[in-house]
Amino acid sequence: MKICLIDETGAGDGALSVLAARWGLEQDDDNPMALALTTEHLELRKRDEPKLGGIFVDFVGGAMAHRRKFGGGRGEAVAKAVGIKGDYLPDVVDATAGLGRDAFVLASVGCRVRMLERNPVVAALLDDGLARGYADAEIGGWLQERLQLIHASSLTALTDITPRPQVVYLDPMFPHKQKSALVKKEMRVFQSLVGPDLDADGLLAPARQLATKRVVVKRPDYAPPLADVATPNAVVTKGHRFDIYAGTPA
């Protein structure tokens, strides 16, 4: 995959070249999207809209730390949707990991989560965030046990993941309505890189075959059900719903 690669570390240790080789990234100086290695982290930038800033994965500080410490925990909609109850903490495959937010919430509550991400740039961002998270004194211990990254396409990986999870979680990119053009800055940068998941409908059937208990699909409230398969079961929040489908018992 071609992207503009920028090294701002000043270390001169070739770390960016190693990273590019690992994730199959090619230097493209004219690409509007850039992956920059700073002294703090790896971040994604939209070069033609610099005011949007850089996107990076941070499990240790910022919004994620606030959500972990002061968020709803088990009361969060995603936790309710996957079926967390009492001692039941399902094993989850997050088949559309994105920036790892929902996966992190589930891991922080106690679930073991395997994240799938097919886009190499997004996978590199997740891997960078995980490395910093694993090294953190406060959360590193449980994070290493509960949150892992698999760089693969969900369309193929969902058929051969072992052991089978109890829950498969899907949050495919959905084209935003025109009127929400001022979508969060971060989402604009992210969508410029990955675009909508046009093949997302193909995920529902293999996800239901893989999950032993249920499949949870996060949708904007205005979006039709995934693959046009309606379900009466959903956890509804302001702006979103979590559609729930039966899996295939082991």
UniProtKB/Swiss-Prot annotation:
- What are the leading ranks of the lineage? Bacteria, Pseudomonadati, Pseudomonadota, Gammaproteobacteria, Enterobacterales
Listed binding positions for S-adenosyl-L-methionine are R101, D102, E117, R118, S153, S154, D171
The Swiss-Prot or TrEMBL record describes its family as follows: Belongs to the methyltransferase superfamily. RsmJ family.
Give the Enzyme Commission number: 2.1.1.242
Question: Which Gene3D superfamilies does UniProt cross-reference here?
Answer: Vaccinia Virus protein VP39, YhiQ-like domain
Reactions it catalyzes: guanosine(1516) in 16S rRNA + S-adenosyl-L-methionine = N(2)-methylguanosine(1516) in 16S rRNA + S-adenosyl-L-homocysteine + H(+)
Q: Which organism is it from?
A: Klebsiella pneumoniae subsp. pneumoniae (strain ATCC 700721 / MGH 78578)
Does S-adenosyl-L-methionine show up as a keyword for this record?
yes
Would you tell me the protein name for this molecule? Answer: Ribosomal RNA small subunit methyltransferase J
Q: Its biological function?
A: Specifically methylates the guanosine in position 1516 of 16S rRNA.
Where in the cell is the protein located?
Cytoplasm
Give the EC class as a word: transferase
